[in-house]
């Protein structure tokens, strides 16, 4: 089902499709891409492939993973951008100007999972860059928890560590999943 959200024109997963499965490029909601959700879906697919042995899905999953990592990565400032418009238009509420903790977590898991399954060094390099960005900009060195988001340039916008969406989930899962993958890679 996740592949149904992949827009073949862009080679990435979008947040929404129309009821008929087509993509609405005429509205901001229809053009929305969330690299964090897409990459979370991709590492779920890799877990499924690993446990089921259905390797037929691997090539497509790896292609979508690398496309999304390249698309979501901020080439100027580093980190995974939280939301993007597939046509490059501004999003409502300047959401593309944030980098939140959980897309970094999901992207790191996806990149490391893809490296494990493919041995493609590009995935390992993405993991290293995402991991370094997250630990540098999102971690509170004084009180061990991560801030919920930073601005596009990595500057902290507030000191919140919890919110309606930020709780004790993505960060521990990221740490545990990456440790698990690293143990398998030893």
Segment roles from a protein language model:
Residues 1-186:
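Glycan-recognition and catalytic cores of secretory/periplasmic carbohydrate-active enzymes
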């Amino acid at each position: 089902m996740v592949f149904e959200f992949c827009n073949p024109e862009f080679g990435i997963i979008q947040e929404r499709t129309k009821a008929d499965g087509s993509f609405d490029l005429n509205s901001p909601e229809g053009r929305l891409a969330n690299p964090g959700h897409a990459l979370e879906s991709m590492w779920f697919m890799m877990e499924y492939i690993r446990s089921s042995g259905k390797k037929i899905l691997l090539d497509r999953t790896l292609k979508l993973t690398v496309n999304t990592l390249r698309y979501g990565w901020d080439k100027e400032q580093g980190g995974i951008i939280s939301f993007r418009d597939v046509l490059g238009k501004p999003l409502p509420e300047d959401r593309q100007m944030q980098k939140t903790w959980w897309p970094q977590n999901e992207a790191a898991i996806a990149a490391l999972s893809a490296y494990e399954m493919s041995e493609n060094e590009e995935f390992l390099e993405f993991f290293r860059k995402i991991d370094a960005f997250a630990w540098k900009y999102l971690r509170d060195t004084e009180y061990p928890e991560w801030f919920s988001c930073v601005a596009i340039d990595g500057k902290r916008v507030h000191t919140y560590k919890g919110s309606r969406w930020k709780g004790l989930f993505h960060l521990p899962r990221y740490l545990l999943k990456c440790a698990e993958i690293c143990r398998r890679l030893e």
